[in-house]
Amino acid sequence: MSKSLQAIRGMNDILPAQTPTWRYLESTFAQLLESYGYSEIRLPILEFTDLFARGIGEGTDVVDKEMYTFLDRNEESLTLRPEGTAGCVRAVLEHGMTGGGQVQKLWYTGPMFRYEKPQKGRYRQFHQIGVEVFNQPGPDIDAELIVLTARLWKQLGLADAVTLQLNSLGSSEARARYRDALVAYLQQRFEQLDEDSQRRLTTNPLRILDSKNAQTQALLTDAPTLHDYLDEESRAHFEGLKARLDAVGIAYEINPKLVRGLDYYGRTVFEWVTDKLGAQGTVCAGGRYDGLVSQFGGKPTPGVGFAMGVERLVLLLETLGLVPETLNPAPHAYICAFGEAAELAALALAERLRDELPGLRLLVNAGGGSFKSQFKKADKSGARYALILGDDELAGRVVGCKPLRDDSEQQSIAWDALPERLAACLEQV
């Protein structure tokens, strides 16, 4: 096959057999978010590159290695969004949505792009559902975000498959003090660090904490911990969050090495992880970013949010057999028409039934065919009834109704009575 007729590596088609699961996940979460008072915002997938360089941070893997960046015809550097928070912050600033202390509770969904090594659960084009809250500084809103995700897991049947991990990164001043202590500790052991961690020691030392290298992790056993450097305000914020989670019975683990991969986070960070998907265990992650709005030139504005990976959640639902069987239901009926006059009548009949029976799943045979071939297609469709129109039915103003899923006899039903009779039959299913 020609390369031009193949999807780009790491960018996948989502086929009709898969889309019902996607719609189920997206609609379930959308309804949940709306019940908590969140509003949808739709954001462009292209932004100026500087937005991500300033927001995510120079020296991060995302900015240095993973962004899809190019010059447009005006020589402007543009980037396909690698995440949603920076674009959402840009939007609320551009449209004055946080002025005067306005609280904004927003959500969005769509594709993100990162040049990573494709593997199961990790792609170069991937989809996220993101949630952002502005002008709510307290631990109560941090708790709400975690509580609503816990409710989503319960609705999806995933409550026993995921674990909540928490940490506090403290204030920027506390992180700076901790960074100095960590760098001093690791510089004495520089030769024992893996190559990637050696590079990060000068660019983004906190990211060494979540290194996947076993030897580096062993070195970190006796390293200083961030909690020893937390300022009192951050410590109180974290205790307030834990108290709220305890109050609603949400279990959590404190992970002092949880730092997240984006520089804008401070204070609360959290991840929901699973051991059911191998290496790609994080299905939802987020935290607080109180300094990001001012970093973009706005007034200091508290912010907190999270994003969840749709592909990973779909994979988790499929792996655990939690995709509802009713997501792609078979048609209720299939109209078989024999002859040109019957085909015209079938079209009119179908639209009348759709008018009178909202929600009716109805297929009309297309392309003609013999009695046998049309019945074969009706049966293959999974329809419960075949509705038959031919010259005799037209002459008698009736429709043949043949049950396809049991041995019941075919009936002739008057045109005018068909909607009521068909509705009664469907109610018995």
From Swiss-Prot:
One of its GO terms (cellular component) is cytoplasm. InterPro entries: aa-tRNA-synth_II, aa-tRNA-synth_II/BPL/LPL, Anticodon-bd, Anticodon-bd_dom_sf, His-tRNA-ligase, HisRS-like_core, HisRS/HisZ. Disulfide bonds: none annotated. SUPFAM superfamilies: Class II aaRS ABD-related, Class II aaRS and biotin synthetases. It is found in: Cytoplasm. GO terms for molecular function: ATP binding; histidine-tRNA ligase activity. This is Histidine--tRNA ligase. It comes from Stutzerimonas stutzeri (strain A1501) (Pseudomonas stutzeri). The lineage of its organism: Bacteria, Pseudomonadati, Pseudomonadota, Gammaproteobacteria, Pseudomonadales. The gene is hisS.
